[in-house]
Amino acid sequence: PTANVSVYASYSNSFTTNTGVDVNGNLLAASIIDQYEVGAKNTFLNGRLTANVAVYRITNSNLAQQAAYLADGTTPNTNSNIKTLSGETTSDGVEVGVNGTLSKNLYFITGYSYNNTRFTHSAGNKGSNIDGEKLVNAPTGTANASLFYVFSSAALKGFKVGASGFYTGSRFGGYNNTVGQAILGSRMVALTGFTTVDLSAGYTYHDISLQCKLSNLFNTLNYLVHDNYSITPIAPRALLVTASYRF
């Protein structure tokens, strides 16, 4: 580490209780989660530019998912409260962020994330997930970029405008495949990546703030959730206005 560079390493171990029951009506064991992470942060140009990078691995020893079959092993399960512990999942990822000030009034924020989440050490019995298969609804890459301008002239002091773009990469919808499944072929559905753009404007006067945002400017159509029982599209173009007062 130097005056402009900082590094860190961390490890955490935690558990998450799982709701629902297994196919025999028993409560589910907790999920044990281990996270390892190392990262670094650096500043350039006398603090006007900041860059950071982090590399991590997250393992979940007991991922709970809706059971594919009931206790007889042949009847499809349609009850989302009946679940199975699918075995271990592992997520390896990298996060990069670059933020900076271009002028007294203009600044930007950017970020990119890569994530590879897949099943590891599954049970191997009928209905269990397949080692190495990526989890559905887990994009490999996401990115964001925002540019903001803050007015400083006497006539416009307190006004701020901005534009932001958000990218969600390709991923799979549907359901993950299981050992011994009856359906032929794959149950996973390939979903394309998509980008949305937001515009924003705000005004602050003492303790009063007014914010206006036009989200999904180009009315992009894609899906947040896509499985056998529901298809949830991303929010369409919308105008959001909020007012707040700070006590």
PLM feature segments, named:
Residues 59, 166-183, 202-247:
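C-terminal beta-signal and adjacent terminal beta-strands/loops
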Residues 6-10, 31-101, 108, 113, ...:
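Membrane-embedded beta-barrel scaffold of Gram-negative outer-membrane proteins
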Residues 84-176, 242-246:
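Gram-negative outer-membrane beta-barrel transporters
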Residues 9-13, 40, 51-57, 110-114, ...:
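Transmembrane beta-barrel strands of outer-membrane/channel proteins
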Residues 32-36, 90-92, 139-143, 193-197, ...:
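Residues that define the transmembrane beta-barrel architecture of outer-membrane proteins
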Residues 19-26, 62-84, 119-136, 172-189:
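Solvent-exposed loop segments that connect transmembrane elements
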Residues 4-7, 46-51, 105-108, 154-159, ...:
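Repeated loop/turn-to-beta-strand initiation elements of outer-membrane beta-barrel proteins
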